[in-house]
Amino acid sequence: MEYAAIHHQPFSTDAYSYDGRTVHIKIRTKKGDADHIRFIWGDPYEYNDGKWSANEQPMRKIAATEMHDYWFAEVVPPFRRLQYAFVVTDDHEDIFFGSSGVCPYNEKTLETIHYYFKFPFVHEADTFQAPEWVKSTVWYQIFPERFANGREDLSPKNALPWGSKDPDVNDFFGGDLQGIVDKLDYLEDLGVNGIYLTPIFSAPSNHKYDTLDYFSIDPHFGDPELFRTLVSQLHQRGMRIMLDAVFNHIGSASPQWQDVVKNGDQSRYKDWFHIHSFPVTDDNYDRFAFTADMPKLNTANPEVQKYLLDIALYWIREFDIDGWRLDVANEVDHVFWKTFRQAVSTEKPDVYILGEIWHSAEPWLRGDEFHAAMNYPFTEPMIEYFADQTISASRMAHRVNAHLMNGMKQANEVMFNLLDSHDTKRLLTRCRNDEKKARALLAFMFAQTGSPCIYYGTEIGLNGENDPLCRKCMVWEKEKQNQDMLQFMKRLIALRKQENTLLTEGHLEWNLLDDKNDFISFSRTLDEKILIYFFNQGNVVQHVSLRELNIDRNKKICDAWTEQPLQHHDVIAVQPGEFLILSAAAPV
């Protein structure tokens, strides 16, 4: 047994409160090392005849990567206090693993109380909690300038005819909020129930990430009453809306920055920014990346903090928005985000806080900052396997597992899963315009825990390279839309919503990772219900024998996509590039 590979970190995603009473425990071992692990636990104050009263239960192996196995236990301490350790067993020995590391497994070790990990008290206030509605939300991301032109009188004077060319960086086409209002029937029919808008506040650019005034709607998009109408109509349809907050930086045309440019170190706003010297030049202040027109805000400054918090609360109080997506969230200090979380959650307890973070987001997902991050690290291995074909099926599965093991279960359940956005190549382009691959990838992503999002136009086959080509105008002429893709997305979204509880909370198990033939199978299970997925990314037909799946004969099996009943002895062909979803459940 390789002792150095055994890892458990208390007070982390390895040991946390799931719901204010239940504690989730994980431990990692070298892959294939441990035969089984026993979890030893009890109340630190409970003794019987002078001996600590301990409970023992087996742990379940829930995931594996190329190097490690992950084991899981769930306990409900009756007095909310927990003292615990692990007994790891292989072919040759039992070892005790606790706060002092690896120890011999014997009576003396078991009775040495300071060798045990502690979870002093399970506080509900310390429990990561996210809005329940997010678990049942399918998001649709809209880049407002390119979605629909509902009022030509709002369009910039230099706006080009809608969809007349592929966009350049500085082009305008006249998309606005009225265009979104006009298309709500379309969005409802598609099945999405959450709308994420990139910035809508006053700004000179088409993307609006260079904010002029956070308290006003950009005049080319509309006005407060039009936005109020949009929010009201969304809520009437049972749909949610999330806005984009750019609090890392502000636009260089903003009055605050212009005051600094004009007045230098005499400006009342000089401490709002990270300025190295005066007067301001092109290279003596911090900005987003190296973008001169996006000076970075100093969020440690109390005036800046109040300004930004007032903005966040204003749009909640005045318009009842449901969420904030936070741009460049990883470059803003944790102290500010903790204050932000407290302020907005106090104002609206079920508001959703989403951070734009392109790497592991665990430091922001501990319950006192964000509810979720844009889950690029989770979906990137899926894209690399299905679209790029640069990694194997097993490598993809291992990376997916590693990402899930790095998070708390309730955080994974509300993560923002996406395959493309305004910052990436479009999905179809990433798939080299192979629609089968795009469909398989979407079906795969929609089968995972988390809140799925599609980027506007994906459902009708819109393609596009990186920015600005990923920000094309939406196509509204039906004859120019891919209607087969549209019907596919409607069915995929409907299936996700139908099986939402299972796909959000259910256990993921990989059944088959055939790297040679590019054939994958995994299952999602919750209670007595199971969905079994098969993806054939190879070049030959694969056959699935239902008899060999050993499904309980009391359960009814059907093709979850077509809802066609199946028999336990059926054999189903999965064509190259296609997928199969089986549903098995006890008869109602």
Curated annotation (Swiss-Prot):
<dbReference type="Pfam" id="PF02903">
    <property type="entry name" value="Alpha-amylase_N"/>
</dbReference>
<dbReference type="GO" id="GO:0005975">
    <property type="term" value="P:carbohydrate metabolic process"/>
</dbReference>
<keyword id="KW-0963">Cytoplasm</keyword>
<feature type="binding site">
    <location>
        <position position="325"/>
    </location>
    <ligand>
        <name>substrate</name>
    </ligand>
</feature>
<feature type="binding site">
    <location>
        <position position="149"/>
    </location>
    <ligand>
        <name>Ca(2+)</name>
    </ligand>
</feature>
<feature type="site" description="Transition state stabilizer">
    <location>
        <position position="423"/>
    </location>
</feature>
<comment type="subunit">
    <text>Monomer or homodimer; in equilibrium.</text>
</comment>
<feature type="active site" description="Proton donor">
    <location>
        <position position="356"/>
    </location>
</feature>
<keyword id="KW-0326">Glycosidase</keyword>
<dbReference type="Pfam" id="PF00128">
    <property type="entry name" value="Alpha-amylase"/>
</dbReference>
<keyword id="KW-0479">Metal-binding</keyword>
<feature type="binding site">
    <location>
        <position position="174"/>
    </location>
    <ligand>
        <name>Ca(2+)</name>
    </ligand>
</feature>
<dbReference type="InterPro" id="IPR004185">
    <property type="entry name" value="Glyco_hydro_13_lg-like_dom"/>
</dbReference>
<dbReference type="GO" id="GO:0004553">
    <property type="term" value="F:hydrolase activity, hydrolyzing O-glycosyl compounds"/>
</dbReference>
<feature type="binding site">
    <location>
        <position position="176"/>
    </location>
    <ligand>
        <name>Ca(2+)</name>
    </ligand>
</feature>
<feature type="binding site">
    <location>
        <begin position="422"/>
        <end position="423"/>
    </location>
    <ligand>
        <name>substrate</name>
    </ligand>
</feature>
<dbReference type="GO" id="GO:0005737">
    <property type="term" value="C:cytoplasm"/>
</dbReference>
<dbReference type="InterPro" id="IPR045857">
    <property type="entry name" value="O16G_dom_2"/>
</dbReference>
<protein>
    <recommendedName>
        <fullName>Intracellular maltogenic amylase</fullName>
        <ecNumber>3.2.1.-</ecNumber>
    </recommendedName>
</protein>
<comment type="similarity">
    <text>Belongs to the glycosyl hydrolase 13 family. BbmA subfamily.</text>
</comment>
<dbReference type="InterPro" id="IPR017853">
    <property type="entry name" value="Glycoside_hydrolase_SF"/>
</dbReference>
<keyword id="KW-0119">Carbohydrate metabolism</keyword>
<dbReference type="InterPro" id="IPR006047">
    <property type="entry name" value="Glyco_hydro_13_cat_dom"/>
</dbReference>
<feature type="binding site">
    <location>
        <position position="471"/>
    </location>
    <ligand>
        <name>substrate</name>
    </ligand>
</feature>
<comment type="function">
    <text>Hydrolyzes beta-cyclodextrin to maltose and glucose, soluble starch to maltose and glucose, and pullulan to panose with trace amounts of maltose and glucose. It is also able to hydrolyze acarbose. Can also exhibit a transglycosylation activity transferring glucose or maltose to another moiety of sugars by forming alpha-(1,6)- and alpha-(1,3)-glycosidic linkages upon the hydrolysis of substrate at concentrations of 5% or higher.</text>
</comment>
<feature type="binding site">
    <location>
        <position position="249"/>
    </location>
    <ligand>
        <name>substrate</name>
    </ligand>
</feature>
<dbReference type="GO" id="GO:0046872">
    <property type="term" value="F:metal ion binding"/>
</dbReference>
<dbReference type="InterPro" id="IPR013783">
    <property type="entry name" value="Ig-like_fold"/>
</dbReference>
<feature type="binding site">
    <location>
        <position position="467"/>
    </location>
    <ligand>
        <name>substrate</name>
    </ligand>
</feature>
<keyword id="KW-0378">Hydrolase</keyword>
<feature type="binding site">
    <location>
        <position position="155"/>
    </location>
    <ligand>
        <name>Ca(2+)</name>
    </ligand>
</feature>
<keyword id="KW-0106">Calcium</keyword>
<feature type="active site" description="Nucleophile">
    <location>
        <position position="327"/>
    </location>
</feature>
